[in-house]
């Protein structure tokens, strides 16, 4: 099965300026991500960036770059620009690999592409079991519930499904029904072309979750439990140091 990995690498970052170029043992972070994407078996890996310094670093490592505008509101919009630039066919499978996840397991990059290929959805993503009460009730941990066929019913920052009987007794025992959504997506190129024509939805604006736009307009999102536990992305200097320590170890 063939798929293309696209890595949006926006230079500006409020908490960690120049994040894609952050050094991790002699290599920019974006190059680590690119190498992980290659290990997934992607037929092509493209870094989409708005900054020439990022482009130069990727090219120096033998990577492919697509320069994009700096005014995109989301990674999906940046993805759409790349799709139009290359003129990818509507049925081409594209995996959006976050540019700030240098430890992403290659197996889940391939998994989400394969899941999309085997489904009727225009988009696929992954989730992992929630194992702690702290995470279960943390609004920064996005929860997802699916139907019997593995298609998303809803994504929320709230604790869903709400286990009424269990939580009435104690919120320390959360059971095994909760799943946390992780931010890796596969799309068919034609779906991305449609997506960027839709106006933002009310639910998306309330929850601040872009994927709710898809459900609002009646489209399907395939969701499966990830084969490997993803790592936390790099948003701060502390996150960056943890990644450096992990790779060194």
Curated annotation (Swiss-Prot):
Keywords noted in UniProt: Cytoplasm, Lipopolysaccharide biosynthesis, Nucleotidyltransferase, Transferase
Gene Ontology annotations of biological process type: CMP-keto-3-deoxy-D-manno-octulosonic acid biosynthetic process; lipopolysaccharide biosynthetic process
Short name of any one Pfam family annotated for the protein: CTP_transf_3
Swiss-Prot/TrEMBL catalytic activity: 3-deoxy-alpha-D-manno-oct-2-ulosonate + CTP = CMP-3-deoxy-beta-D-manno-octulosonate + diphosphate
Any one of the GO CC terms: cytosol
Primary residence: cytoplasm
Task of the protein: Activates KDO (a required 8-carbon sugar) for incorporation into bacterial lipopolysaccharide in Gram-negative bacteria.
Xref: NCBIfam families: kdsB (TIGR00466), PRK05450.1-3 (NF003950), PRK05450.1-5 (NF003952), PRK13368.1 (NF009905)
Listed name of the protein: 3-deoxy-manno-octulosonate cytidylyltransferase
Organism: Serratia proteamaculans (strain 568)
Gene that specifies this protein: kdsB
């Amino acid at each position: 099965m063939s798929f293309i990995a696209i890595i949006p690498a926006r230079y500006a970052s409020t908490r960690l300026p120049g994040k894609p170029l952050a050094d991790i043992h002699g290599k920019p972070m974006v190059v680590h991500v690119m190498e992980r994407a290659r290990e997934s078996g992607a037929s092509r890996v493209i870094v989409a960036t708005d900054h020439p310094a990022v482009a130069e670093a990727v090219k120096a490592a033998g990577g492919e770059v697509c320069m994009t505008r700096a005014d995109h509101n989301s990674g999906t919009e940046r993805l759409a620009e790349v799709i139009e630039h290359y003129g990818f066919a509507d049925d081409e499978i594209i995996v959006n690999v976050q540019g700030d996840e240098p430890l992403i397991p290659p197996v889940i990059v391939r998994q989400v592409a394969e899941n999309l290929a085997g489904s009727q959805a225009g988009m696929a993503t992954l989730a992992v079991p929630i194992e702690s009460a702290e995470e279960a009730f943390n609004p920064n941990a996005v929860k997802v519930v699916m139907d019997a066929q593995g298609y998303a019913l809803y994504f929320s920052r709230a604790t869903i499904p709400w286990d009424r009987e269990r939580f009435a007794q104690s919120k320390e025992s959360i059971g095994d029904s909760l799943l946390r959504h992780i931010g890796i997506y596969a799309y068919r190129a034609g779906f991305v072309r449609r997506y960027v024509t839709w106006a933002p939805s009310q639910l998306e604006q309330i929850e601040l979750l872009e994927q709710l736009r898809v459900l609002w307009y009646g489209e399907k999102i395939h969701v499966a439990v990830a084969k490997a536990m993803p790592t936390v992305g790099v948003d701060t200097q502390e996150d960056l140091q943890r990644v450096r320590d992990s790779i060194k170890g």
